[in-house]
């Protein structure tokens, strides 16, 4: 045995025990068995429980031994010796005693050894030796030790559940006595030894009210395993299981257990139908499971079958899967098949048919995102042509007139009747009966919604149906304004005469091919329209712009009146009074139309929509003046809509929908065709404008306690590199005064934060206030500062909420701000920065009531002493010192320290030494109650020094002086480095990623 171990254990020399940590591991690794054998008789002595000196010596020796085992990875080699020491601890009382409930010395030793052993829970041979003894500590009455053992045994059960199966009785006794953490072990043990766990399963049900959600889930997972093999074991638990149905966390798995029980013995669940109904109502996601249980349990008699059928029919229209349960019940009891059942089935089928109608005809949603909206037509339309593989995928909305809507999918037209190859209008097809899902007819001038959306299987498909009264000339359905588009796409079909295809959305990177779905009927429209796009050099754009030219298929007589002018609501956000001077236009689609995309971010070209009308008779042309509408698109391009104007709106024979824009009352009339500008604005910007006074008052108050970060970035932490990387937010603070002696004139104080949500919210509010004070307007999410915060929030994924929800939520409360203040305090920010009242007389003053500046900017009179680098003392006095390795076990030494602008020097009985300030990398502060510094740790390249005032005073002054000197030294030596003088408590080694 090593000489130092021999002296410490033989003489119980506590003064030398701390020196054991100076001995290299290699010198004592072979003596561990002998050391443990020497410790065993010491702790077996009757006087050990009362001898504090012996307890301290043994605890230090055990800690050193366990440290050596861990570092040298020799746990398997010395496991037997450690287990022998555990057996010795088992012979003594391990329960906390006295009013302070202090842990007995043997319990402390056992806890240290057990935690060290179970670090190797994946090693089977070690677990074979340790588990039998470790389990014996469960009934010893030490709750803390038992709770820790539950966690250790859960880890061991992952790979070695078979080793725990012989100890199931001890585990169950500990669970029943209140150690519910062991419930997580039972499922693993059951999989390898079901006979050991099954008899105890019913005993767990009364414990559920005292368990937390994870422990309850562990019990139900065990029950789900048991009910598949031995359902009879849980028959007595049915009432308690039904009582747990209202728990949303475990409702689904409880239903699965009850379903297996109903299959085993249907009569068990008959008396609990009402509880099942209530559970399904509370948790709608369990309706299918509930229906299966009631069907399986109720099929035994006609009365119970009727109850089950009533439940199934109640939810059948919204749960198509329940038709199978209705079929089972009606097959068992045909008398139950009544008109009510038939009506429900028909309603469900009608809903499905309507969804198919929407999916196949009315809302042809391709992989490019095409939505077809039907307006009043009776003629069939051709199927969509597939887009070539190389074509970009787009989001498209197709607006088609339709007179009636059928609940039955319309078959695609044959080539003989399809209007693709014909230049004449298509003959009207016989309309199918309209489904009851649409009831309201539009009135003249009605700007409200005139129809309801039929149910669809995908919520992203938008379908609007219009049934315009014969002869009406106005009232375009307002839901058309939801087609927020700034681009135009064409549908093939030279004589389709009126398909209006409006494109929206960004172009995905991957090409997408379209399927060949049928398209709903469309009516003929009139005058052809030329839609062209040019870049700034006048060259037609074929990629990134619109290049569409239409040819006339048939000239519409003027007696038929004007056609529909439909344009994008986003294009028409800003319009003038001249824009709507009785303009009437139409868009018709040629057969050879090409699909193109107009990017919304770079629109330098002008898109024009104008009539290429044939020559009109003189009498007709005299009554029509030409109007021009110029509308801005994204601020730097124009949309020009020109064409003949008219005040005549005669009755049309084909009863198709159209819109008349009358400019005589354009300022007084509500335009149902276009969304108001306010609706299209950024909701965050609207929120800030509406609540700016509250935001300004709040930030003026908060600025007194919290500094605003100037920037936020992201680091990728490697703390958990073996499992995954972790993204950490990093804050950058600047001095807001920037005086001549500023510590951070060229650098930023940076710190990592564990509360990015609150900081991002505070930064957002601060950005808004500062921008408003300067520019008299608030920022939108498109501005660079706000968009950067939004990107950081999306990358961090702190919570399952959007950036808009975060910044429009309630302002951070006092307790949230206190957490941020503590972060600043622990990072050392408050040691080098101070808050002061903003000087409003300064033209470059801070926008808020208070400003945060570094110490030297707030106290320029003290700058000379800190910055001259001389040896003149700034602070001096006696400090207690510890340094070197294993400082925890070393004694404090009192020495006299002097801090100047260049050195930290000390004097003592052993002589004097000095540390150059430039060598100090950082200072870490240890704080006590009320955040008062107790000690501080100085880190250099080759040593670590712990200091604290001898009398406990002046610690805060020492920390501040050290922080300022170090900050100035680092800024002087590395003026471009963006680093803080006092790094926050490390979250892990990290590398910048954003």
Swiss-Prot record:
UniProt entry keywords in alphabetical sequence: Cell membrane, Developmental protein, Lipid metabolism, Membrane
Compositionally biased region (Polar residues): 486-517
Annotated GO MF terms: molecular sequestering activity; phosphatidylinositol binding; phosphatidylinositol-5-phosphate binding
Boundaries of every PH domain copy: 872-967
Domain of life: Eukaryota
Gene Ontology process terms (BP): cell fate specification; cellular response to starvation; lipid metabolic process; positive regulation of insulin receptor signaling pathway; positive regulation of TORC1 signaling; R8 cell fate specification; regulation of signal transduction
Region (Disordered): 404-461, 486-521, 536-565, 973-994
Pfam families, per database record: PH
GO cellular component, one term: plasma membrane
Membrane topology: Peripheral membrane protein
Function: Participates in fat metabolism regulation by recruiting FOXO and the TSC1-TSC2 complex to the cell membrane, which positively regulates TOR activity and negatively regulates the expression of FOXO target genes. Involved in R8 photoreceptor subtype specification. During early embryonic development, may be required for ectodermal patterning.
Membership in a protein family: Belongs to the MELT/VEPH family.
Identification of the protein by name: Protein melted
Organism: Drosophila melanogaster
């Amino acid at each position: 045995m090593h000489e130092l171990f021999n002296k410490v254990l033989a003489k119980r020399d506590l003064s030398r025990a701390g020196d054991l940590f100076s001995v290299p591991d290699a010198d004592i690794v072979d003596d561990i068995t002998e050391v443990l054998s020497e410790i065993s008789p010491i702790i077996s002595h009757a006087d050990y429980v009362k001898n504090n000196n012996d307890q301290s010596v043994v605890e230090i020796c055990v800690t050193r031994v366990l440290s050596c085992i861990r570092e040298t990875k020799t746990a398997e080699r010395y496991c037997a010796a450690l287990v022998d020491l555990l057996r010795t601890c088992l012979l003594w009382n391990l329960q906390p005693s006295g009013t302070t409930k202090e842990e007995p010395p043997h319990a402390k030793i056992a806890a240290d050894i057990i935690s060290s052993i179970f670090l190797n829970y994946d090693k089977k041979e070690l677990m074979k030796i340790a588990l039998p003894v470790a389990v014996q500590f469960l009934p010893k009455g030490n709750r803390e030790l038992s709770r820790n053992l539950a966690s250790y045994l859960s880890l061991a059960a992952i790979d070695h559940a078979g080793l725990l199966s012989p100890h199931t009785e001890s585990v169950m006794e500990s669970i029943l006595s209140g150690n519910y953490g062991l419930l997580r072990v039972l499922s693993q043990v059951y999989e390898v030894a079901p006979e050991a766990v099954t008899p105890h399963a019913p005993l767990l049900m009364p414990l559920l009210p005292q368990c937390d959600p994870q422990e309850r889930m562990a019990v139900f997972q065990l029950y789900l395993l048991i009910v598949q093999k031995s359902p009879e074991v849980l028959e007595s638990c049915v009432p308690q299981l039904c009582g747990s149905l209202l728990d949303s966390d475990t409702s689904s798995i409880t239903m699965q257990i009850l379903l297996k029980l109903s299959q085993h013995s249907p009569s068990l669940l008959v008396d609990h139908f009402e509880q099942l109904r209530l559970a399904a109502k509370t948790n709608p996601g369990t309706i299918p499971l509930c229906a299966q249980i009631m069907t399986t349990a109720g099929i035994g008699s006609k009365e119970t079958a009727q109850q089950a059928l009533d439940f199934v029919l109640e939810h059948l229209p919204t749960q198509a899967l329940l038709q199978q349960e209705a079929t089972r019940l009606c097959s068992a009891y045909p008398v139950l098949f009544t008109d009510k059942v038939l009506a429900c089935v028909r309603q469900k089928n009608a809903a499905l048919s309507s969804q198919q109608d929407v999916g196949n005809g009315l809302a042809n949603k391709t992989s490019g995102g095409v939505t077809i909206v039907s307006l009043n037509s009776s003629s069939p339309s051709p199927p969509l042509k597939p887009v070539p593989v190389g074509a970009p995928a787009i989001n498209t909305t197709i607006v088609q007139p339709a007179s009636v809507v059928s609940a039955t999918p319309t078959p695609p037209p044959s080539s003989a009747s399809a209007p693709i190859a014909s230049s004449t209008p298509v003959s009207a097809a016989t309309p199918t009966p309209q489904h009851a899902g649409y009831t309201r007819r539009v009135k003249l001038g009605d700007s409200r919604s005139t129809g309801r959306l039929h149910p669809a299987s995908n919520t992203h498909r938008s379908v609007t149906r219009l049934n315009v009264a014969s002869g009406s000339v106005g009232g375009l359905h307002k839901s058309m304004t939801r087609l927020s588009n700034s681009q135009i796409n064409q549908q093939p079909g030279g004589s389709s005469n009126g398909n209006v295809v409006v494109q929206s959305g960004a172009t995905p990177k991957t090409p997408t091919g379209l399927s060949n779905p049928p398209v709903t009927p469309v009516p003929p429209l009139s005058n052809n329209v030329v839609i062209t796009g040019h870049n700034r050099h006048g060259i037609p754009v074929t990629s990134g712009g619109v290049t569409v030219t239409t040819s006339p298929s048939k000239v519409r007589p003027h007696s038929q009146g004007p056609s529909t002018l439909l344009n994008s609501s986003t294009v028409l956000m800003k319009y003038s009074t001249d824009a709507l001077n009785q303009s009437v236009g139409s868009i018709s689609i040629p057969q050879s139309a090409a699909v193109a995309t107009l990017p919304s971010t770079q629109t330098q070209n002008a898109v024009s929509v104008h009539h290429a009308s044939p020559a009109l008779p003189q009498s007709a042309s005299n009554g029509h003046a030409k109007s021009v509408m110029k509308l801005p698109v994204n601020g730097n391009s124009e949309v020009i809509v020109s064409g003949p104007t008219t005040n005549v709106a005669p009755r049309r024979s084909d009863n198709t929908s159209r819109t008349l824009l009358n400019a005589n009352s354009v300022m007084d009339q509500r335009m149902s065709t276009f969304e108001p500008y306010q609706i299209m604005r950024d909701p965050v910007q609207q929120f800030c404008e509406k609540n700016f006074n509250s935001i300004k008052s709040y930030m003026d108050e908060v600025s007194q306690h919290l500094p605003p970060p100037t920037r936020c970035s992201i680091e990728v932490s490697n703390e958990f590199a073996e499992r995954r990387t972790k993204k950490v937010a990093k804050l950058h603070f600047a001095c807001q005064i920037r005086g001549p002696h500023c510590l951070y004139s060229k650098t930023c104080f940076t710190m990592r934060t564990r509360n990015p949500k609150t900081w991002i919210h505070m930064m957002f509010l601060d950005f808004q206030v500062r921008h408003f004070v300067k520019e008299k307007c608030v920022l939108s999410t498109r501005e660079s500062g706000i968009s950067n915060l939004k990107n950081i929030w999306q990358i961090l994924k702190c919570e399952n909420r959007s950036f808009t929800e975060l910044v429009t939520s309630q302002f951070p409360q006092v307790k949230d701000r206190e957490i941020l203040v503590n972060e600043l305090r622990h990072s050392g920010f408050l040691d080098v920065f101070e808050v002061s009242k903003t000087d409003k007389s300064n033209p470059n003053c801070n926008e808020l009531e208070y400003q945060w500046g570094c110490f030297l900017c707030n106290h320029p009179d003290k700058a000379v002493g800190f910055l001259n680098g001389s040896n003149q003392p700034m602070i001096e006095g006696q400090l207690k010192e510890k340094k070197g390795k294993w400082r925890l076990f070393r004694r404090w030494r009192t020495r006299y320290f002097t801090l100047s602008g260049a050195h930290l020097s000390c004097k003592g009985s052993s002589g004097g030494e000095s540390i150059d300030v430039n060598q100090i990398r950082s200072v870490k502060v240890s704080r006590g109650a009320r955040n008062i510094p107790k000690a501080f740790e100085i880190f250099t390249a080759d040593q670590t020094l712990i200091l604290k005032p001898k009398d406990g005073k002046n610690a805060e002054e020492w920390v501040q002086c050290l922080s300022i000197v170090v900050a100035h030294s680092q800024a002087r030596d590395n003026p471009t480095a963006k680093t803080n003088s006092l790094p926050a408590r490390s979250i892990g080694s990290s590398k910048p990623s954003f």
